[in-house]
């Protein structure tokens, strides 16, 4: 209604309850020349912005995987499953950090509350260049965990969002594969590298403040938002493919 009335919109995630609805909103905003921005709040935190900065700098090298654990006890909901509740956080972060488009997704889930809605799910998303993302989502955990590991060719990044001070740690650890000797001997030779660990400085500005500033700037400067409607639509497309995969017993589902 707001877009139809000619108003710019900052909308809570997910963008819509279906891909069709999301496509309509994005199309309407484009048609009317309005800002449609998604509340992907994590993308405006100092930690995630620092992760983006480190990735863009090339310090980590080639990215190999994104492994996220987002678990806690509850809150069980009557209208959505754990995927629609928790996955939008990680999917929006992935969309912000990873420039390549995801190819396909496979997922398995289980319901233990008798209402037919999954309260635990394991989601695997495949990208080009052999990059893979894995999400562990759970409403039935005795512990609250918010941890992500990004594995790469040069260094490794660990983000613990529950850590009050040192949320991000960079590990100078990895492997080296000796290709020439492997070809000669017909077997894999791997050496391991273990160096220093350092904690980068993170901007402590409140994420909601950064997001609102971005929204206002986009309106004034007539530019696309960092987490615009298109970003929200991409998250919806993965959510849809994830649900299809669960219904098909974990089959790979292409992401449209």
Q: Where do the PLM segments sit?
A:
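Aromatic/hydrophobic pocket-lining residues that form π-stacking "cages" and hydrophobic walls in ligand
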Residues: 23-25, 51, 241
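Rossmann-like dinucleotide-binding domain that binds NAD(P)(H)
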Residues: 73-143, 149, 163, 230
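C-terminal capping/lid region of NAD(P)-dependent oxidoreductase domains
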Residues: 34, 244-256
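Rossmann-like NAD(P)H-binding beta-loop-alpha module
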Residues: 46-68
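Short glycine/serine/threonine-enriched helix-capping/active-site loop
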Residues: 37-40, 66-69, 107, 135
């Amino acid at each position: 209604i707001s877009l139809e009335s000619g108003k710019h919109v900052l909308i809570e995630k997910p963008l819509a309850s279906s891909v069709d609805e999301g496509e309509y909103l994005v199309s309407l905003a484009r048609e009317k020349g309005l800002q449609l921005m998604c509340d992907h709040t994590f993308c405006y935190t100092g930690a995630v912005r620092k992760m983006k900065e480190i990735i863009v700098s090339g310090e980590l090298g080639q990215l190999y995987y994104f492994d996220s654990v987002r678990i806690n006890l509850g809150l069980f909901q009557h209208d959505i499953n754990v995927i629609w509740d928790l996955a939008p956080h990680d999917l929006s972060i992935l969309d912000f950090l990873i420039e390549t488009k995801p190819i396909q997704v496979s997922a398995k889930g289980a319901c233990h509350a008798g209402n037919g809605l999954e309260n635990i799910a394991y989601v695997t998303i495949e990208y080009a260049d052999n990059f893979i993302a894995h999400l562990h989502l759970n409403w039935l955990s005795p512990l609250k965990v918010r941890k992500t590991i990004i594995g790469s060719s040069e260094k490794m990044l660990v983000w613990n969002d529950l850590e009050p001070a040192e949320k991000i740690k960079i590990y100078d650890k990895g492997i080296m594969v000796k290709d020439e000797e492997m070809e000669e001997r017909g077997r894999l030779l791997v050496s391991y590298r273990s160096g220093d660990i350092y904690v980068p400085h993170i901007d402590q500005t409140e994420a909601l403040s950064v997001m609102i500033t971005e929204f206002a700037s986009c309106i004034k400067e007539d530019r696309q938002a960092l987490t615009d409607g298109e970003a929200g639509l991409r998250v919806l497309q993965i959510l849809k493919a994830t649900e299809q995969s669960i219904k098909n017993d974990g089959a790979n589902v292409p992401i449209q």
